[in-house]
Regions:
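Positively charged, low-complexity terminal tracts
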Residues: 1-91
């Protein structure tokens, strides 16, 4: 990804996934980077970050999205991911 905003290295959770952005009147698909982190010093949240490859986008400007999750929210998300992964595997 050229013009990348997120740092990607060996510790990045998923460095190449299929991504999609939807807005009023557009849908764009691009490769994406998805990462989960927490602060090294005094961790008080879990961050989930997503960046679509800006070289594949026509409508959106280069950007990265991030949400801050409490430990409880992160565990709920992880449980939901596990449940849906199991559903897909069993289909």
């Amino acid at each position: 990804m050229a013009d990348r905003l997120m740092t990607v290295n060996a510790y990045t959770t998923l460095d190449l996934v299929d991504g999609e952005a939807k807005g009023h009147g557009f849908t764009e698909e691009a490769f994406a980077t998805l990462n989960v982190t927490s602060p090294r010093k005094n961790p008080d949240h879990v961050s989930l970050q997503l960046e679509l490859d800006p070289t594949e986008l026509d409508t959106l400007a280069p950007h990265a999205d991030s949400v801050r999750l409490s430990p409880e929210q992160a565990r709920k998300l992880a449980a939901d991911l596990e449940k849906h992964a199991k559903n897909v595997e069993q289909a």
